[in-house]
Amino acid sequence: MIDIDGSYGEGGGQIVRNAIALSAVTGKATSIKNIRKDRPNPGLSAQHVKAIGIAALLCDAKVEGIKIGSTNIAFFPQEIRGGKYTIDIGTAGSIALLLQCIMPIATYSNTNIKLEIKGGTDVSWAPSIDYLKNVTLSALSKMGYRCNIDILKRGYYPRGGGIVNAIIEPSHLVPDRFSEERGTIRGISHCSNLPEHVAQRQADKAKAILENAGHECSIETCRTDFTSTGSGITLYCGMKGSFVPGKRGTTAEKVGNDAATSLLDELLTPSSVDIHLADQLIPYLGLAEGGSFTVKEISPHTKTNIWVTEKFLDVKFKIEKRNDIVKISIQ
C-alpha cells in the first residue's frame, strides 16, 4: 500500500489524478488522505469522483471513500482492460483533466480504449482540449504514446455539454530528450452562441501581438451554436502553448492579448517545453524510466508530481538550474 498525503505541496486534485493513474499502472494499492485539505471546498469534487470511477473501471479496482467531499480514499487496482466507455462529467467539469488521469492507464491496456466524454472543453483552471490535443499529445507521441482526439462539441462554463471522442492505443513508452522547437505559431479561436466577431477579435488581437514580436502565425476561427455559451483561444508552437477561456465582462481583445503574451513569455526562454506541459510529462518520464526536458521554471505542480511519481516508481528525478532554465531528467 502506497500512502499519499493529499495536502503535500500544492495540495490540489492533481495529486489524486496522478496517484490513481500510477496505482493502476503499477498494480500497487494506494491510500490518499487529506485530499485538498486547505482548499475552500476540501475533498473530492464531482469531476474527481468521475475520474476515479472511470480509472476503477479500467482496472477493475476496488475503491473506498469515493464520494463528493471525501478527504480519504483507498484504491485497489487489478488488471487493466480495454473497451468502450461513455463518461458524463456533469456541467463544465474539465475533459482534459479527466483525460490526464486516464491517459497513463490506457497505454497499458491489452486493447484499445475508446472514450466518449461529455463535459467542459474550455474552462478556467484547466488545459483546453485544444492544448491537450496539439501540445500534450504532440509531445507524448515522441515517447511512443498513441492517442487520437476528436472534438465534436465545445463546452464552456457553467453549462458544459462539450463532447470529445478519444481512442487510446496500447503502446510502449520510450525515453525522449525533448529539445526546443520553433516554427509558425498556430491556434484556434472559437465561440458558441455569440457573434462571429468575438472569435475573430480574439484571433486578430493575438495575431497582431505575435506578429509585432516577429513571429509568423496562423489562427483558425470558428463559430458554432452548441449547448453552452462561451469563447476561448488556444495558441501553440512546438511543445509550448497558451489557452485562455473567455468570460463574462472580459473583452475579446483582452482574451486574445492574454493568450498571446502568455505564449510570448514562454517563447522568450530557450526551454523545450512550457510550464504547463512540464508537470504533465513527469509521470511519463518515470514510466519510460528515462528522458529529459527543459522548462523556464519548476512549478509547484511539477514538484508535487515528481514527489508522487517517485513514491510509485523506482526512479529518481534530477533537477538542474542552467542559466535561465531548469533541466529535469531521470537519474
Curated annotation (Swiss-Prot):
Uppermost EC category: ligase
Residue sites binding ATP per the record: Q100, H276, L277, A278, D279, Q280
Domain of life: Archaea
Catalytic activity: a 3'-end 3'-phospho-ribonucleotide-RNA + ATP = a 3'-end 2',3'-cyclophospho-ribonucleotide-RNA + AMP + diphosphate
Enzyme Commission number: 6.5.1.4
Active site residues per record: H301 (tele-amp-histidine intermediate)
A Pfam short name: RTC_insert
Gene Ontology cellular component terms for the protein in this record: cytoplasm
InterPro entries cross-referenced by the UniProt entry: RNA3'-term_phos_cycl_insert (IPR013791), RNA3'_phos_cyclase_dom (IPR023797), RNA3'_phos_cyclase_dom_sf (IPR037136), RNA3'_term_phos_cyc (IPR000228), RNA3'_term_phos_cyc_type_1 (IPR017770), RNA3'_term_phos_cycl-like_CS (IPR020719), RNA3'P_cycl/enolpyr_Trfase_a/b (IPR013792), RPTC_insert (IPR036553)
Claim: Hydrolase is one of the keywords in the record: no
GO molecular function terms attached to this record: ATP binding; RNA-3'-phosphate cyclase activity
Function: Catalyzes the conversion of 3'-phosphate to a 2',3'-cyclic phosphodiester at the end of RNA. The mechanism of action of the enzyme occurs in 3 steps: (A) adenylation of the enzyme by ATP; (B) transfer of adenylate to an RNA-N3'P to produce RNA-N3'PP5'A; (C) and attack of the adjacent 2'-hydroxyl on the 3'-phosphorus in the diester linkage to produce the cyclic end product. The biological role of this enzyme is unknown but it is likely to function in some aspects of cellular RNA processing.
Name of the protein described by the UniProt record: RNA 3'-terminal phosphate cyclase
